[in-house]
C-alpha cells in the first residue's frame, strides 16, 4: 500500500534560516542567540520539518535589532496548486485553526518600527506559537485539499485577518463581508479592532464552494481545530465588517491594496569606496599559522555545528546533505530527484557598496547550489534595511535591489517571492543593509550530489577563476588587520551589464 506521504498533493519539505546578532561582547547577544536557536529548533522539531541549512552572523550594527529570517520549502504537484484569489459571489468565508487572542496585535507594525529604551514594553505584540496546533492545522488543510472544496486559502500572517481577507478579495476583484462576533476568541471582550489586527498563530482563512461547509467542518473537528463560517464574498468591492449586528467598517478594498498610496522617497546614490592600499609592511610581522587561527576563531567563520545540531535536520528521512555544507539537499521521496536549498547574505558587502553587494549575494547563492551539483532554479528574498525616510538608507535599498535584479537576470535566476523589512534601527542607529537570499536548485539524480569534504589522499585541488588578491572587506582584513573599509570584490562577468 502507498504511504500517506505519497498520497499527499503537497507537503512542507524543509526549512532554512538566516539569523543575525550583535557583537558577541554585547551583553544581550548570548541570551538572544540561545533563545532564537531554541525557538527555531523547538518549533521545527515539533512540527516535523527538517532544518537543512542556514547561516549565523555577528555584527555590532545588530546590537539593537537582531534579524531572524526563515525560509520554508514545499513540494506540490503542479496541477494541485492552491491560490489565495477569491472567486464567485456569496461563497462562504471560513476561519480555521486556533482561537484569536490579543497576542501579536500591531506585530507587523512593530516589525517595521524604530526601537528605543521602551522596547521591553512591546513584548505583548509578539505572537505565541504552538507547533503542535500548527501540525494539526497542516494535516487538516492537506486533507481538505484532496477534493474540490477550496476556492482560495491564505494564512493569517502579518496584520492577521485584515491582510488575509483584503488580499484574497483584492486578487479576485471582489468584496468581502465578515461577522467578527463569529470569530473564535480565547480572550473575553475583544473589540473588532483587536480581532482584525490580532496575529495569533496557527490560523487560516478559506473561501469554500457552497455546500462544502459540513464536510470541511467534520475534517477540522476531527483534528480538534476551530471551524467557523465568518462571512461571505460579495460584489461590493468593499470590506464590510459587522460586530453584534452593527456595521463597524465599510472600506473600499482597492484603497487598501491596488490603489493604496505609494511613497516616492528621496534617495542618495552611494559611491564606490577607494581600494585600501595594502603594503608589504602590513604583513611583515604576521605568521601564517597565527593568521589562520585568528580567522578560524572569528565568530563569523568558526563552526556553527553547536547551533544546527539542535535542529532536527533528518526528520522525514530524506535529508542526504546535512547543514554545514554549501547547501542542504533532500531527495524527492519516491524518485531519483533531489532538491538543494541555501540561504545567503553579506551585510558588509552591501554596506560598502549596495549595488555590488546585491549582485554578490545572488552569485554566492548560485555558486552554493552549483557546488552540490544542483541546477539553480529560483530565488526568494527577505530585504532587511534601516529607516527608508533617510535618503542614505533608501539609497542602500534602491541599489541593493538593482544589484539583485541585474544578477538574477544575467544568471536567469528568477525571483519568485520575497518581503521587505524597514525601520530596523534602535536609538536612531540602523542595521547594515542585509538582503537575505534563499535559493533552490534541482539535482536530477541524487547520486550525482557533490559534497565539500575531501575524499582521499592524493586528490587534485584546483582553483577555478582568476585570483585577483582582493583583500578589501575580507575576513582577513577585518580580523587580522582591523581594516573594515574598501569596496567588495568585483564580479567579473557582471561588470559590463
Question: Can you describe what each PLM-predicted range is?
Answer:
Residues 198-209:
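Short cationic amphipathic helices and targeting signals
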